Every structure is written in C-alpha cells, then in structure tokens.
Amino acid sequence: MLRKTFKHFISISAIFVLIFSIYTYAGEYRGEVISATGEVYIIDSAGEHHAVEGPGYPVRETDTLVTDQGGTAIISFNDGVLSVLNENSRLRVEKTYWLSHLGGKIYFTFRKVFNGTRHVKTRFATLGIRGTTFIIYDNNDQQAVALQEGLLDIESHGPAFEIHRRHQLDEFEAFKQQQMQQQQKEELRKEFDEYRQQLQREFIEFKRNFSMQAEHVISFDGDRVDERVIDDDAMADFENFEAIAGDLLEEFREQARPHRENIESQPVLDEEDFE
C-alpha cells in the first residue's frame, strides 16, 4: 500500500515537473511575426529551429529570429515595438523592454512610453530608446546606426568611445563670406585650415555614453565612433524598409498616435512640483 502511494506521488511530481519545464522552456510571450517572406525561422532556448511560414507565429523571451538570404520578417512586440529584419539578420528577444541585435540590417520603430527606457543591445554598444525610428547595421562592411527620428542614448560595453563629430560645410561658407573682403584667397585658405584644425580638436570627445540626434549616422570601428549627417544611402534604406512593411507600418503608426498624443498632452513637471 505504501509502495503504491509512493509511486503515485512520484508520478504526480513528475507530471508537475514536466509541466513546469514546458512552461519555463516556452518563455514569456513577447509578440508575433506579422509577416514573413523567404527563409525565416526561430531558434528557441533549447536550440531547436522552427520554420516561420506565415503571419501569427508567436515570439517569446529567449527566441532568436533569423532570416536567410532573400528572407524578410516583420515582428510586432507587445511593449510597443515594430521591427523589420532584412535578409541575413538575427534578432534575439530578451525580457520586456530589451532586444539584442546579433547581426545584419534591422529596422526598429518604438512608440513613446510612460514607464521607462527600452534598450537594444548590439555587439558594439547598448542603445537606450524613447519613441525612436532607426536602423542598426552589423555585417562585414560596417557597424553603424542611422537615426531617422527621436533620440538615442549610446553606451559603451567597455572603455570610453573616441567620438569624432563632423562639422557642416556651411561653417566654412560662413567663415569665407566674413573674411573674403579682407583677405586674399591664399591667406584665407591658410586661416581656414587653422580654423578647421581647431574645430577638429574641439569635436573629438572621449565618453562612455553620449546622445545621438535625429537625422544622423554613427559608425563604429572598435572604440572609435564617427558621426555624420544622414546620407542618401541611409535614407534609401529607410525607404526600402518602409516599403517592405507597407500597410503594417501604417497600422502600427495609427495605433501609436493616440498614445503619443496622450503623452505629449501631459503637463511637464518642474522641480518645485516634487518639493
């Protein structure tokens, strides 16, 4: 009798352990694939590959989304993110408010939220995000971020970045106009060379974290960061991603609009409001 009861207890315990293991293995639901073309699959926490053959495929914590040559995928996350993976790209899903870019070219657009900053971790930096649209590049050709709108906080994984900020050519034009009437051309060029060297010294910074403004591109080469105004190539990439997303992106933006307007209508509190 005792032996039979013990066996019954062991069987029930095993069932509970199995159920718990399945629940843990599945991970928390984070969103779903809303469009997929070509070779797209998900690698789960156990390393199993699951082909994504159409919309509605659930995405959970610890899943890694992968697109092969010619594949694209659009994922809608439940914390207010829409992401578009280009071919040969990998995106790991972490806990809420966290994603990890593992490689390739991926487009992100984030809704504004009340409760804290979202993050995307890359191999070269961690990006802190609030209501932003940007592309991350990480392939054999480059490691870079192109920011269309919003603001990004860039944080190093290790030592301080050596940040080089390119100055606009209109600085030279303004300088030239001011000096043209007083200096000969050769003297003007000499003065401007000295002025440009001074600007270059002033716009090299060493920081572990810094802010990136909209309509700029930053490129990474080890600890060196080069910032420049967004160029035609980056703008073409945004247009290509928006064409891939099509109506799905428009629906996402429409859903985000009331939330954004609600945030923007909130009063800005001064320090004395907390005293």
Place the predicted regions along the sequence by residue:
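Active-site glycine-rich loop that binds ribose-phosphate moieties when present
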Residues: 128-134
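Generic short beta-strand segments
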Residues: 38-40, 70-72, 132
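Active-site/binding-pocket entry motifs
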Residues: 39-41, 91, 107-108, 135
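Short, small-residue-rich packing micro-motifs
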Residues: 59, 65-127, 145-154
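C-terminal interaction modules
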Residues: 2-14, 23-29, 47-55, 60, ...
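Short N-terminal segments immediately surrounding and downstream of signal-peptide cleavage
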Residues: 27-43
